């Protein structure tokens, strides 16, 4: 009701999008400097940093196995050596599910779903309990490769862990972490100033260079662990579609996984 908090800072775009009645319309003037795909097109959600689905590879274990994208994960040499969390319970694993579907043909494409089947057949039933278990498991040498997300993987690279980041050649989705102004916020002026602040050049450069959050601003600074967007095959998630069909996508994955486990 806006009596306490003024802004919801952080959280998924899809959750905010499906609860439009809770938010105050506002588009910052700084939105003009945002990468086109992540601009505030709906009028009430401000994306401020991006997190991409990536593969994390243990450089001590990979040997001469080529991993450039999703297709390479079907290599029989990787069976049982692929780390992933459960798309039914992990937001990063679900993001990878929708990313691979989009990259391999589409959310409703039979060949894309066949890829999901083949991948989880190669995962061989080894599901990590959490998202952190994926990148930690790869860094610790329990797995050769993991389906993870950019932020913690970039930090591991900066920390000197024996890992590298692979942006899938078939296409990498970046999802925005978002902020909204709560409808009826008591101090509306300051709420709008905060939205302007997180989209400012100063803050965007700090996030990209000092932290491991990828900025949404065009030409913002990033650290050495993060490949420039221009060098990545970026594909755009249909966020409204995924939001509307999430339960169906999860159910279809669960059916595939359960069937594989029964064999």
What is the predicted role of each segment?
Residues 1-142:
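Extracytoplasmic ligand-binding site segments that recognize negatively charged/polar headgroups
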Residues 12-18, 139, 144-162:
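A ligand-binding cleft/hinge motif common to bilobed small-molecule-binding domains
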Residues 25-28, 163-167, 216:
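Short hydrophobic/aromatic-enriched beta-strand-loop microsegments
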Residues 71, 135-136, 154, 192, ...:
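Alpha-helical segments flanking ligand/cofactor-binding loops in enzyme cores
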Residues 96-103, 119, 126-128, 149-177, ...:
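N-terminal secretory/targeting leader peptides
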Residues 172-173, 177-237:
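Mature extracytoplasmic/periplasmic domains
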Residues 236-263:
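Conserved C-terminal helix/tail region of periplasmic/extracytoplasmic solute-binding proteins
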